[in-house]
Structure formats: C-alpha cells, structure tokens
C-alpha cells in the first residue's frame, strides 16, 4: 500500500501527519518509508531525527554547446519550447534556469554540437529512523526547477 499526504497549502499539518503515520505503521511490524518530497523546505527530519546513511548530490542534465562545432543553424532554438536556448548572431546561448532537460536540442542538432552535462541542483539523503526508512531531498538555494530533484 502507498499513501501520499499532499496539499498546496503550508501549515496544514502534512508533515506531522505523514511522520506519525509512517512511525505508527512501522511500529506495528509493517514496512514503512517516509519520503519528504518538499525539496524546497523538507522538515520531516525534525520529527523523525533519522540516522543518515547516504548523502549524495542530485543532478539535472543541461545542454552545453561546443562553439567549434556549432553552425548557428537555429534548430535547437526553434525546438526548445521553454526558450532555454537562443541563437544570437554567431553565438548560441543556453539559459540553464529555463531548461527542462528534455534533450530535444541535442537530438535535433545536425552537427552534434550539443552535449548534456550534469549540473548539481541539490542533495538527496537516505537513512532510517528506527523502523522507518527515510528519504528527503533539498534543492539548492536559487534553483527554480524542483521536479528533477523530486524524481
């Protein structure tokens, strides 16, 4: 069974309910995991006080244009629905804050001038609090895209 506690409103008690539910389920001999997907301000750790076993970076793939190969044809710019890549004169600019990491620009480039490189955007912590498995993620300050960290 999977139970998700979600709401768009802050301060409604989601974390209190979710941490207590996970603890109660695990205390009754069932397998329970607490996943704090509020990557902008996770605070389940304040209630569960987990022992962190792993702490690793979260990455998002961003396009990097090789200026030596780029012909400035503009296909990448026309393909990007988010305006994250633009051809201006003899330059191809990448706006990483707008990029959704779909890889479309890389796929349409006729000269393979675009590759993807990982960019760190936050941290993933994995551990346990007694019988409860614990996972949370934290987005770096200034990062605008939370879905890659939640995945």
Predicted regions: what they are:
Residues 1-28, 32:
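Walker A (P-loop) phosphate-binding motif
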Residues 16, 39, 71, 75, ...:
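Conserved active-site and cofactor/substrate-binding residues in soluble primary-metabolism enzymes
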Residues 30-45, 118-123:
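Short beta-strand-centered segment that lines the nucleotide-binding/catalytic pocket of NTP-utilizing
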Residues 40-61, 126-132:
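P-loop NTPase switch/communication element
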Residues 64-83, 93-113:
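Cysteine-centered iron-sulfur cluster-binding motifs in ferredoxin-type domains/subunits
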Residues 84-90, 95-102, 139-151:
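Phosphate-binding/switch loop-helix module in NTP-utilizing enzymes
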Residues 87, 116-117:
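Short beta-strand "wing" residues that participate in macromolecule-binding interfaces
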Residues 119, 124-151:
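Extended interfacial segments that mediate partner engagement and assembly in macromolecular machines
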């Amino acid at each position: 069974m999977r139970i998700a506690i979600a709401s768009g409103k802050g301060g409604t008690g989601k974390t209190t309910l979710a941490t207590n539910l996970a603890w109660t389920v695990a205390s009754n001999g069932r397998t329970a995991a607490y996943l704090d997907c509020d990557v902008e301000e996770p605070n389940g750790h304040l209630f569960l006080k987990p022992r962190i076993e792993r702490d690793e970076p979260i990455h998002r793939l961003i396009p990097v244009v090789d200026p030596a190969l780029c012909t400035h044809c503009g296909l990448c710019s026309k393909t990007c629905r988010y305006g994250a890549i633009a051809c201006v004169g003899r330059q191809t600019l990448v706006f990483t804050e707008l990029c959704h990491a779909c890889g479309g620009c890389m796929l349409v480039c006729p000269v393979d001038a675009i590759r993807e490189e990982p960019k760190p955007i936050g941290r993933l912590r994995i551990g346990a609090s007694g019988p409860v498995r614990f996972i949370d993620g934290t987005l770096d300050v200034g990062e605008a895209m939370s879905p890659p960290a939640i995945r």
